[in-house]
């Protein structure tokens, strides 16, 4: 599967990032779409994506997940010897444009931006 860069997130304001996320379904939305998320219903997600409901502020787990991203990348590299690169782009599937990805990090054979399209997400 290949993806294109929808937007750079490097210096993007949080509010702008939330607006971009309305354009599709990301990893955090997948469990909601499947009906297995106990915190949000598919109808609530649809209402958020269509601007009929304000997105809820991220909870404690999401906060700590974001805070610990750099630590997890560093520990993975320490244990495996594989470098993890920061990906400061919001990616969109070329085959299924509703699919979005905002990666915490990437390693291996990933080419983004001026190179070949991202492959094998």
Residue ranges and their predicted role:
Residues 77-97, 104-106:
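A short acidic/basic microdomain associated with nuclease active sites
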Residues 60, 68, 90-91, 107-111:
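Short, flexible loop/turn elements at secondary-structure junctions
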Residues 106-121:
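Active-site beta-strand-loop-beta-strand hairpin of nuclease catalytic cores
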């Amino acid at each position: 599967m290949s993806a294109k860069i929808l937007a750079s997130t490097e210096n993007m304001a949080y509010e702008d990032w939330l607006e971009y996320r309305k354009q599709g379904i990301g990893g955090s939305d997948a469990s909601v779409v499947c009906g297995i998320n106990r915190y949000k219903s598919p109808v609530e997600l649809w209402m958020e994506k269509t601007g009929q409901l304000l997105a809820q502020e991220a909870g404690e787990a999401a906060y700590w997940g974001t805070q610990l991203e750099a630590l997890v990348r560093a520990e993975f590299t320490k244990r495996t010897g594989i470098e993890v690169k920061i990906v400061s782009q919001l990616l969109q599937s070329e085959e299924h444009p509703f699919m979005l990805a905002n990666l915490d990090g990437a390693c291996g054979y990933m080419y983004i931006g001026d190179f070949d399209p991202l492959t094998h997400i």
